[in-house]
Structures are given as C-alpha cells and as structure tokens.
C-alpha cells in the first residue's frame, strides 16, 4: 500500500485480466465471492480490488492527493468497472472514504492494443541462468487510447505516444469485437484441432478463412463507423499480427476464463446483430467453446480448462442431458432472449 499512499504517486496502471475485477456482469456490481469476503475481513489480501481499496483508504487518511487509476484490461468501460468494484468494496468499510473515491479519484476508460503472451521461463533464461521478474514479452505493435478531458493527465504522460479521445467506445469496440473475439474463437477452434499456438491455427487456411468471414459478415457490419477509420484494414492488420511466431502465444492461455470473455467478446456482438444476418459463425464459435469444455480434440492434446465457473460448466457438459441448452440458458454468460436463443 505504500506506493498508493505516497503523495508522489500520480498514476497507477492496472493489468490483471478480466477475472481480476471480481465484477458481477449480471448485477453490475462487485461480486462478493470468497476472495473478496476474505479481503473485507482483512485476512491476507488476495485480490487487486482489496490491495487497491486499502491503499486508497490509507491515501485518504494520509494526504487526500488526487490520483489516476488507469485500467488497461479488455473490458468495455474498464475504468467505470474498476471504480465501481473499488467503491463497492470501500463502502462496506467506510462510506465517507468511498464518497471521496467516487468524487476525487479518477478512473479513465482506456483501450490498449498490444498482444502480450504470458511470460514464463524463456530459453535464454534457462541457458544463462538469468531471471528478470519484471520482464514483459510483447509484439512490436501497440496502441493506447485514453478517454480523458483533463490537461493534468496529459501533462503527466506528455512523452508517451498515447491518443487522448473524448469517447473511447469506438476503440473499445474494435479491439474487443475484432481482435479479442478472433483470439477467443481461434483458441477454441485451434485447441479442438490439436494446435497449441495462435500462429499455428491462423496459418491453417480453413481456420483463417473462417475467422476472416466471421469478421466480415457478422462483426464489422455491427460496428458503427467513425471518421476515416478503416475497419477492414484494422482487421487485416490484426490477422497479420496473429502470424507472429516469435510470440509463441498459447491458445490455452487465451481460452482461459471463457465464461467471462465470451459475453464481452462474442455475445455482445450477437445481441447487436444485423437482422439480415444468420450468425452461423458465431454459433460455431460457441459450439467450439462447449466442445473445448468437454476436451474434445482430434489429436488428443491435453489441456486444462481454467475458468471461474469450471465446476458448474464441467458438471453440465459431462453429466447432464441437453447440456448445450443448459449452457445457453446460463444468464450470467449469455442472457439471451428466447428469440436470440
């Protein structure tokens, strides 16, 4: 908490993946699960929400200096979600401090576009017996948009190639619905076909054509165009970036937490669908996810199903009849009308 409390700290950036927010999509509030309850009871802190909340509580007591908390995760309105879970948490401890956070701490929404695989031991670390815990491996491409009207934040970040915009929604949409949705689709499709890495599955002509048609026919038509931004060119660049074999981006990593990612990346597009489109590709992607849960793949490649809902999902797909229907009826994932089902 010392860094959060220090009045010299002006900006904190957050990158923890979607599940690190403990946000209940259905109720639009903090998910009071076992880890959050643990943190509220002041046991050994387990969550980002706990660390950040207690740090801001101490900052309130020490100096009440302004601070920017910047989420860099793949969530629509990520800053609003982070602010909501933190204020929900703190309000259970001290409502006055929660009000200060609500009014004074800034949580801008952002879109960060740079593929960053999970970094474990790299070959040279093994060979040279060298370890760097701060190492981040990523692709050369990067884009960072921040929704912001404050000149103060711009002054803090003046030497960075950050694009400040009045409304982040368009940039969120293209990242989530084109890049992230394609990543998830390729993960489930690729694992079923026995591939391990993104560059392998995108190099399969059938898989490339599938994703390309999915984006052209079912995704891009739902995105409202802005200025002179070329959505087709962005799509082509994304698919080209996926071919970078140096990243060694594991499909198993991308396939994690599907119950959180699918509503945001895949289903949200379907809910805003064009009435003249049948959405065959979207249906196939969801079917691939269900088969992924059943560990059905043609090369018998073994992978782990890591998901906060894994117990419930695996029980449905492995032990219950009409399992696809039961999964589609899970409101916290699909939340579909009868017409959309």
Which positions does each model-derived feature cover?
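Substrate/ligand-engaging "lid" and interaction regions
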Residues: 1-341
């Amino acid at each position: 908490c010392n860094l959060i409390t220090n009045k010299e700290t002006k900006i904190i950036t957050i990158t923890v993946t979607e599940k690190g927010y403990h946000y209940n999509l259905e109720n639009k509030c903090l998910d009071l699960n076992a880890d959050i309850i643990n943190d509220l009871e002041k046991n050994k802190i387990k969550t980002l929400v706990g660390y950040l909340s207690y740090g801001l509580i101490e900052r309130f007591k020490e100096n009440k200096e302004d601070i920017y908390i910047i989420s860099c995760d793949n969530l629509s309105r990520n800053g609003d979600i982070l602010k909501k879970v933190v204020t929900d948490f703190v309000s259970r401890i001290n409502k006055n401090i929660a009000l200060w956070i609500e009014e004074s701490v800034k949580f801008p929404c952002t879109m960060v576009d740079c593929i960053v695989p999970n970094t474990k031991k790299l070959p040279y670390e093994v060979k040279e017996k060298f370890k760097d815990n701060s190492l981040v491996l990523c692709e050369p491409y990067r884009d960072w948009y921040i929704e912001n009207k404050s000149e103060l934040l711009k002054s803090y970040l003046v030497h960075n190639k950050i694009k400040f915009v009045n409304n982040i929604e368009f940039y969120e949409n293209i990242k989530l619905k084109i890049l992230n949705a394609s990543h998830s689709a390729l993960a489930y499709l690729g694992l079923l076909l026995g591939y391990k890495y993104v560059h392998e599955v995108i190099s399969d002509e059938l898989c490339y054509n599938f994703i390309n048609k999915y984006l052209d026919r079912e995704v891009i038509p739902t995105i409202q165009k802005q200025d002179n931004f070329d959505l087709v060119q962005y799509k082509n660049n994304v698919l080209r970036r996926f071919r970078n074999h140096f990243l060694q981006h594991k499909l198993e990593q991308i396939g994690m937490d599907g119950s959180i990612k699918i509503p945001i990346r895949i289903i949200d597009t379907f809910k805003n669908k064009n009435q003249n489109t049948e959405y065959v590709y979207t249906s196939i992607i969801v079917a691939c996810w269900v088969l992924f849960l059943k560990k059905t793949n043609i090369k018998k490649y073994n992978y782990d199903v890591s998901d906060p809902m894994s117990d419930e999902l695996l029980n449905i797909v492995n032990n219950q009849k009409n399992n696809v229907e039961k999964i589609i009826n899970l409101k916290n994932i699909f939340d579909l009308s009868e017409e959309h089902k």
